[in-house]
Amino acid sequence: MAAAAVLAAVPAPAHAARPHQSQDQGNGTTVVVSLSLSKYTAVKAIDAGSTVGVKPDVIRVHVGDSVVFVNDDTDHHTATSLLNAATFVDDPRWTDDALRPNGEIGPGFWSTGDLSPGQRSAPLIARKPGTYLFGCFFDYGAGMRGEIVVEP
């Protein structure tokens, strides 16, 4: 079973700093990301635009690492990729595919699927270096967005 660092409890040094993580038994580390509009209410500015409700808002991982999203809120959330976006777009034009777990972190479509309150996503493996933006299917308009930076 993979060990995971819960990042909500780790003070964020720099907004894009790679946090301390435990080595898992797979190919890399597992990073846990918290989704909650009620806990993380401060709007933050990152390179891609403004974000709220995601801790940390910028996640740094390496190829082979995995990211697990946890819904720490009382409402449903997703973490769903924004295809080919360098900044947060006004309308991501997602379909209901965002409500089903799909894909791996990389240039293609990926999503945690619909996460109920308290639910953890399946691990999403980072497969290709790059910067990947994501948002919540339900609360994108409220600013629930983030960025994953995958390093070699």
Q: Language-model features: where?
A:
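Extracytoplasmic copper-binding redox domains, predominantly the cupredoxin/blue-copper superfamily
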Residues: 11-152
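Bacterial N-terminal signal peptides
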Residues: 2-9
